[in-house]
Design a protein with these regions (language model features):
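Conserved HGGG/HGGXW glycine-rich cap/lid loop of the alpha/beta-hydrolase fold
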Residues: 8-73
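Active-site loop/oxyanion-hole signature of alpha/beta-hydrolase fold enzymes
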Residues: 61-107, 270
Length: 278
């Protein structure tokens, strides 16, 4: 379904009923909202990993952010983390969803962090997967070079400093295998609906200046951080800034896990499921 929010329609999909038979009664289960990674991709990868597991005991709500996937493209000036956070707030109001658990991974964690900073009481629990509060290009480049060699480091530097179609192509060729593992690159490119102009626009216009560190302490929801040690786009040092900035956040590190933590460390799925449904 599509829900209108401030000049755009957001694509939303559901898995699992909110009310479930429990003997002669109906039992209400938690609602969990998932915000995808990116920029420029959609929610579909999660329907093969965390989504089905969580939907066993909760109502799962998948959202494509404005400009992403099956949501309206909107206009480039709206492709900003603040707008996506505002959209999420309006979407929950339109759907009548009160204080859900919210999951955000990688790029999606930026939107979820901003949402949780602006409306601390609007969510019950927060799950962040490989979250960072700022881009930190030197760290990103250094980690790509460490894990993927000089070609990966050079491609990461070129795209973040001079984002365009050419440098994005080189980034995808050299860097995605390091981020995801070589076997996952083709599915990652073919399965989602990509908006590559958005990818370029966001990196060029907002990525270098965005910094959410100062307001991390505003987040009051119970928070679980799930982190892989080998995601070069979201380095350990940058993730640790989020861990240290959110009061009472707990963190679980998965050694050797890359960007797709759920695939590299399947045991993380159970941890997230137990956290959001308990």
């Amino acid at each position: 379904m599509r829900v209108a929010v401030d000049g755009a329609r957001l694509f939303v999909d559901f898995a699992g009923a909110k009310l479930r038979p429990d003997g002669p009664w109906l039992r209400e289960v938690p609602t969990v909202v998932l915000v995808h990674t990116g920029p420029g991709t959609d929610h579909t990868a999660y329907k093969e990993t965390i989504g089905p597991a969580v939907a066993e005991d909760a109502q799962m709500v998948y959202v494509d952010l404005r400009g992403h996937g099956r949501s309206d493209p909107s206009t480039p000036d709206t492709w900003r983390v603040g707008t996506w956070a505002d959209d999420l707030r309006v979407l929950l109001e339109r759907l009548g969803i009160e204080r859900p658990a919210v999951i955000g991974g990688g790029f999606g964690a930026l939107t979820v962090l901003r949402f949780a900073q602006r409306w601390p009481d609007a969510l019950s629990k927060l799950v962040l997967v490989n979250p960072v509060a700022r881009n930190g290009v030197p760290r990103v480049v250094a980690r790509f070079e460490e894990l993927g060699g000089a070609p990966a480091g050079e491609a990461a530097h070129a795209f973040h400093e001079h984002p365009d179609e050419h440098t994005l192509t080189q980034y995808m060729h050299q860097c995605l295998p390091v981020m995801l593992g070589p076997h996952y690159v083709v599915p990652a490119m073919l399965t989602p609906i990509w908006n590559l102009p958005l990818t370029i626009e966001w990196v060029r216009e907002e990525a270098s200046s965005l910094d959410l560190r100062d307001e991390l302490a505003r987040i009051s929801a119970e928070t679980l951080i799930v982190a892989g040690t080998d995601d070069p786009q979201y380095p350990v040092a940058s993730i640790e800034e989020v861990v240290e900035g959110i009061p009472h956040a707990s963190v679980r590190w998965y050694q050797g896990a890359r960007h797709a933590v759920y695939r590299d460390a399947p045991e993380s799925i159970r941890m997230v499921k137990d956290f959001v449904t308990r």
